[in-house]
Amino acid sequence: FYKNTVSTYYYSDLSVKYLNLAKENGYKADDIPEYLGLSYAALEMPMESISAFSEALLIRESDTLLFSIAEQYYKAKQNSASKQYLHRVIQNNQDDELVQKSRILLGNIYLEEKDFENAEKEFNNVLLINKNSADAHYGVGVIYEQQGNIAKARAEWRSALKIQVNHPGALKKLSDK
């Protein structure tokens, strides 16, 4: 395998090739579908990734697997399916980090759907767990922006930048306004 500047798959394409070859030749391992899902995700092939992750879900259900499926549905623009998986992760999980990621993704979905009330609820739930969440501050800022309150929006984006100095969304918003 040769990797140049045009190809930046970092061997994920080879992983897919050889994992599928192993399955075709009868090799059985419980983790093959999960690794296939991760490889397809790295190759930005969400539907194939969802298929592989769903197969892995039948073998062993885990919260990180449910979150990975939700992420891929989000990338495939299937927000209703993504929301269902995110709600399962939030309800059944004790890992604060994964719950935060799930709530932030759910908040972003609500933002896209222009459901600002639920988006704000999700971002505020993240801030209750972790007041130093740059993504949650950024999301609240976007809500304020959509509501026409630019001063509060900019304050939230500055808070995001204090926490994470290179937050891409906050940097872009503050440079645009």
Regions found by a protein language model. Give the residues of each.
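Register position in tetratricopeptide repeats
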Residues: 4, 8, 42, 75-76, ...
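Conserved structural position within tetratricopeptide repeats
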Residues: 17-24, 54-58, 87-94, 124-128, ...
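Helix-start (N-cap) detector for alpha-helical repeat units in TPR-like alpha-solenoids
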Residues: 29-31, 63-64, 96-100, 134-135, ...
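Alpha-helical adaptor scaffolds
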Residues: 68-80, 84-128
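Terminal, low-structured helical/coil segments at or just beyond the last alpha-helical repeat
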Residues: 146, 150-177
